Amino acid sequence: MVLTTGLKGAHVLITGGTRGMGEAMVHKFLQEEANVSYCARTVTNTEYDDFYSTLAEGNTARAVGTAFDVASKDSLVKWVESSAERLGRIDVIIANASPMHMEGETEHWESSFAIDVMGFVELVKAATPYLEKSPQASIIVQSSFMGREFYRSPPAAYGPCKAAQLQHVQELSHFLGPKGIRVNAISPGPVLCKGGPWELYSKINPEWVEEQRLKIPLKRLGGPTEVANVAVFLASPLASFVSGTNMLVDGGIHVGTQF
């Protein structure tokens, strides 16, 4: 018996889809024969041309990108509407874009709130009328284990804004569940991505990164594909009774019991 995700032909929207975990998600959904509409601040629409050649024979799934700032509500709504028109429907949305501000200046708080919180809120609002018509509607937000617990870092915008996402997932799962829309969060732990913060930390303070690695029960950093695999699961009919969940993908570094 071959386990299939049931995502062939699904139509997926992903914010922040050109690098890191967002890029890995686009790859995985294309491999599952889902069509993807993605956005980022900078898009060339050739990001995935080389990747198409790696897809299985007969897989015609494609990804189309749009460049805009997720903090712009008007641009976000326009993107959702144009994606729905081009794809024909929307089955899955993934709020992945994040400025990842680990600093605590006012501008960092404002940027984090605009993208991590309001970007998620407005994406859901814009996409819900389309998701209501889908037989497999799924909303996923990329949060963080730092939204769940304190990670011994100075006061900063990132953790509190990620915590707000988790609370909103709970609200949405109850409100949208009767409409057949599942809502879940993914909370990665330390994940090494090209151009990401952990790659930067590895260059400027490798001793500290090694200390953090040893605190992880699996004794290694995660990879972006490992997070993308969870996104595919949560988006698929395999997770048809999973909603209101915060899926930790952190190698076991979290502390305490998740109720």
Curated annotation (Swiss-Prot):
Record bears the keyword NADP: yes
Family annotation (InterPro entries): NAD(P)-bd_dom_sf, SDR_fam
Signals that turn on the gene: Expression is correlated with the production of patulin. Expression is positively regulated by the secondary metabolism regulator laeA. Expression is strongly decreased with increased sucrose concentrations. This decrease is lost in the presence of malic acid. Expression is increased with pH changes from 2.5 to 3.5 in the presence of a limiting concentration of sucrose, 50 mM. Natural phenols present in apple fruits such as chlorogenic acid or the flavonoid epicatechin modulate patulin biosynthesis.
Pathway(s) annotated for this protein in UniProt: Mycotoxin biosynthesis; patulin biosynthesis
Effect of a null allele: Strongly reduces the production of patulin, shows significant slower colony expansion, and leads to the production of a distinct dark-red pigment.
Active-site residues annotated for this sequence: 143 (proton donor), 144 (proton donor), 158 (proton acceptor), 162 (lowers pka of active site tyr)
Protein role: Isoepoxydon dehydrogenase; part of the gene cluster that mediates the biosynthesis of patulin, an acetate-derived tetraketide mycotoxin produced by several fungal species that shows antimicrobial properties against several bacteria. PatN catalyzes the conversion of isoepoxydon into phyllostine. The pathway begins with the synthesis of 6-methylsalicylic acid by the polyketide synthase (PKS) patK via condensation of acetate and malonate units.
Protein name: Isoepoxydon dehydrogenase patN
Species: Penicillium expansum
